[in-house]
Amino acid sequence: RDQPRSRGLGDVYKRQRQTNKYSDDRPYQFVKSTDGGNTWTRQMVIDPFPCVTDNMMEVYNGQVTYQPAGNGQKERIHIAWTICGEKLGKHAHATYGRNVYYAYLDPSNDHMYNVEGIDLGTTIDNEESDKYCQVLETPIPERGHSAGLQVSVHYRDNSYPVVHYQYPEENAARLSTWDAGEWKHLTFEAKGEPRGIEKLGPESFRIYATMGRGAITFVTNDGGRSVKKEAEIVTPFSLSRCYWIENARPKLKLLMFSNPLPDAPKTLATANRDVYVAGINE
């Protein structure tokens, strides 16, 4: 979900990755406007460079979620991510990937904090990520990614995060939640790529994923401690993206984009994807 996030105070945060000299050096930043978009400033919030064990310095993530102040909690912007790149001695784009991380940004001072509230300053470096922000530590993989590229996060009413990502080791998906001072992990059967988390209630969430020719939804009603499959939506062609629309009309809950169509021209000047919409019976 790449759209800017507004605090309703004239402040807008836009997230993006910075592309540096090497294809596997892509740190993560917020671009912020305090005057409704007239002027912007940059803040590097996650920078894995330099990494001594490998060249996995690309930050990948999915849904970023803004939490307004309420219920005795300060406002914050929740972020979860994984790192990708190459092994030592080579540079390549997203060849391997490992680990899952979480932190949040406090808009009152633009500092980053880990789940326990430790102030990590305006930028989280490689050592701070591993020491303070790890949700899941995985070994350097022999091939592929230890966690999927799309790592999404939402928040429970107590401000603790719910993190959703692929877990290739078990050919499944995972929800990770913070509870009793530690990360708790729920692995559940689900193919496809995570595409967002919708908050339904204090501890209830709908989880979206693309799966070949369609999308699939799951629901948890206990903050990620258990999950059940809810629905499947079938499309004529395989999907590349699926976005849930906040405050949508019932029949326009999902916006979906196909992969390039088999017989379509492969040029930028010609449309070659389908766009679908769908509703969900609440």
Task: Provide a role label for each language-model segment.
Residues 22-31, 86-101, 169-176, 212-219, ...:
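Structural motif
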Residues 45-56, 116-144:
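Surface-exposed loop and turn segments in beta-propeller and other repeat-based domains
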Residues 41-47, 112-126, 185-190, 228-233:
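Beta-propeller fold detector
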Residues 52-54, 58, 185-198, 227-250:
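Conserved blade-ending motifs and adjacent loop-strand segments that build the rim/top face
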Residues 147-174, 188-225, 244:
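Loop/turn-rich, solvent-exposed surfaces of beta-rich toroidal or solenoidal domains
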Residues 33-41, 105-113, 170, 177-185, ...:
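Asp-box/BNR beta-propeller loop motif
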Residues 2-13:
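Single conserved hydrophobic/aromatic residue that forms the stacking wall/gate
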Residues 11-15, 72-79, 157-163, 202-207, ...:
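Entry beta-strands of beta-propeller and related beta-repeat scaffolds
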